């Protein structure tokens, strides 16, 4: 039985690509806890995947969103203002890197990929937060998704590690800026999980095996694990929490060495 932690709240969910997306898992649990949701999709191709998911859980609002296009962002928030007037939480769930550079050496990263990765994976949080702030009339919660590769070198993660490091720093600065309006900003650092995005990382299966073997709980995380953490951060249970990187990784981040040498 759900407890209705988000009953009466409205939330914008970005980053859904298909039914394997972490954003989708978060949306499902948020809906179960009583939230009214608004989905976005990145392109017409993804619209065909996202619309059926929205219909599945009774999400009545869905919009195209290209975070590299200021007009697209403005159109979205104008629509939200018209339909909802205000809302309570935002999930920033998008990230991007050229999959051809998610292997080999980081030093080979192209300027174009560096720019695009930082823009879509990090700067978009700033832009969406700035727009959301004007519509979070009673305070609110902004949550983004990060990964341990922001802190430590993970083979093949490359430019995404740098983008996630910038994202985590942005969380702290945004939390400081927006706290005066009772808007909290946090990140969930999830362990590796099979998604459309992670499939682009070279040798991802090895990453999964290593994580499960090393983590104290001796398993990989599930989408539901991340969904539960997000609902907590969206809800009033976390009303005193902001600027935090919340780990959902079965304890992997606490380990210094997986075995004695």
UniProtKB/Swiss-Prot annotation:
It catalyses: a 2,3-saturated acyl-[ACP] + NAD(+) = a (2E)-enoyl-[ACP] + NADH + H(+). It holds the Pfam family adh_short_C2. The keyword Ion transport does not apply. NAD(+) binds at residues 15, 21-22, 42, 66-67, 94, 164, 193-197. The keyword Lipid metabolism applies. Keywords: Fatty acid biosynthesis, Fatty acid metabolism, Lipid biosynthesis, Lipid metabolism, NAD, Oxidoreductase. It comes from the Bacteria. It is an enzyme of class 1 (oxidoreductase). GO terms for molecular function: enoyl-[acyl-carrier-protein] reductase (NADH) activity; identical protein binding. Pathway: Lipid metabolism; fatty acid biosynthesis. Substrate binds at residue 97. GO terms for biological process: fatty acid elongation. Its EC number is 1.3.1.9. The active site is at residues 147, 157. Homotetramer. Belongs to the short-chain dehydrogenases/reductases (SDR) family. FabI subfamily. Catalyzes the reduction of a carbon-carbon double bond in an enoyl moiety that is covalently linked to an acyl carrier protein (ACP). Involved in the elongation cycle of fatty acid which are used in the lipid metabolism. NCBIfam families: PRK06603.1 (NF005145). This is Enoyl-[acyl-carrier-protein] reductase [NADH] FabI. It comes from Rickettsia prowazekii (strain Madrid E).
């Amino acid at each position: 039985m759900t407890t209705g932690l988000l009953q009466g709240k409205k939330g914008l969910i970005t980053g859904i690509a298909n039914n394997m997306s972490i954003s989708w898992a978060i949306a499902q649990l948020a809906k179960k806890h009583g939230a009214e949701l608004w989905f976005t999709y990145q392109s017409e191709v993804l619209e065909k995947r996202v619309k059926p998911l929205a219909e599945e859980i009774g999400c009545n609002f869905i919009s195209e969103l290209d975070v590299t296009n200021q007009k697209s962002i403005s159109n979205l928030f104008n629509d939200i203002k018209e339909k909802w007037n205000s809302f309570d939480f935002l999930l920033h769930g998008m990230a991007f890197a050229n999959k051809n550079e998610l292997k080999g050496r980081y030093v080979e990263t192209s300027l174009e990929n560096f720019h695009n990765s930082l823009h879509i994976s990090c700067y978009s949080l700033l832009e969406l937060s700035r727009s959301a702030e004007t519509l979070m009339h009673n305070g609110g919660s902004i949550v983004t998704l990060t990964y341990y590769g922001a802190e430590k070198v993970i083979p093949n993660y490359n430019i995404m590690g740098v983008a996630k490091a910038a994202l985590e720093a942005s969380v702290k600065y945004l939390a400081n800026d927006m706290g005066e309006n009772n808007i909290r900003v946090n990140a969930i650092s999830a362990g590796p999980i099979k998604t459309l995005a992670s499939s682009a990382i070279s040798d991802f299966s090895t990453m999964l095996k290593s994580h499960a073997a090393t983590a104290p709980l001796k398993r990989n995380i599930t989408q539901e694990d991340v969904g539960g953490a997000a609902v907590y951060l969206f809800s009033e249970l976390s009303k005193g929490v902001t600027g935090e990187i919340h780990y959902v990784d079965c304890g992997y981040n606490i380990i210094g060495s997986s075995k004695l040498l």
